[in-house]
Amino acid sequence: MIGLRKIKNTIIFIVTVAILTMLCSCCKRSEIKLGSGNEGGIYYKFADTLSDIDENITNIRTAGSQANMRLLKGGFINMGIVQSDVLSEAVNGTGDFNGNKINNVRAVAALYMESFQIIVPADSDIQTPADLKGKKVSVGEEDSGVAKNAEYILNSVSLDYNMIDVCNMNYQKSAEALKNGSIDAFFVVLGAPCDVITQLSEKMDIRILPLDDRTISYMTNLYDGYYETVIKAGTYKGIDEDVKTVGVKAVLVASQKMDSDTVADITKMLFEENDQIKKRISFANNDTKFATDNIPCAFHKGAVVYYNSIGTAITEEDKI
């Protein structure tokens, strides 16, 4: 009898383990493909940080905001990081998405502000964006987001690309060209502080051109997804006063089809693990007001569940 009881208990144990294993397998979240950007960029670094915190997240290297929106539309990724101005164009079918409106993407949270930074040597006679007329200026790589942003800034002061000597270089090459005197200025659209300007400020004295109230009003009123912001004194070596400028938000978005519980968990992680995120991205946002204010896209219902649970009242329809 004892032998039979042992056999019976062993069978029960094996069956229980099998059932638990099967249940755990079923409960485990599916892989979450998160579209980021170019390796070495902040989008890639941010996505890498999230994947370190949540093993179900896989960082997918992409060409950036526009690519992420199109990959989400096609169902090739589950989530993506995008500039707020690109998000606005995509969900409204304007600009680069004219006739190609994207309806299946929802907002999760704004992650941080990407500030427009126009860098010149400290001793330059260039004081405002209008002074760039006739100057040799790097506006970022051809067809990049920063190139479009730079064009908008120039338009705001009645300039266009035909009125400056345009160079199309990436940030690192632009910084090197400014240092050796082969260009007069370059545009950057990144979270501040960013490595490329921090490193340049250690090698030469620089200034960041401020934007006046008229230019800021022009940018924020004419284009959805642009915001007034300030680069604080001390952000970079030699920048001893606050610099008024504009920026776009880096926004985490998700496919509308994504499981609500999963999106709620990821939204929660952004805030509860913010100290961990800030170890790698010092300017990562931890304010729910910033995360949800004036986002040009409806929110995912999973994100809404989390925000409402902590007293931030939004709905799935909240957008600009």
Task: Kindly give the residue locations of the regions a language model identified.
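Bacterial N-terminal signal peptides that target proteins for export
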Residues: 2-13
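C-terminal motif of bacterial Sec signal peptides marking the signal peptidase cleavage site
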Residues: 22-25
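Acidic, polar ligand-binding/catalytic clefts
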Residues: 74-113, 123-125, 191-196
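Extracytoplasmic small-molecule ligand-binding "clamshell" domains
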Residues: 42-73, 78-79, 239-240
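Pocket-lining segment of extracytoplasmic ligand-binding domains
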Residues: 84-86, 94-96, 124, 161-252
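Ligand-binding clefts/hinges and TM-proximal coupling segments of bilobed small-molecule sensing domains
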Residues: 135-152, 223-298
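Bilobed "Venus flytrap"/periplasmic-binding protein-like clamshell domains
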Residues: 29-57, 114-180, 293, 297-302, ...
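An extracytoplasmic/periplasmic, membrane-proximal ligand-sensing/linker region
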Residues: 169, 173, 179-180, 190-208, ...
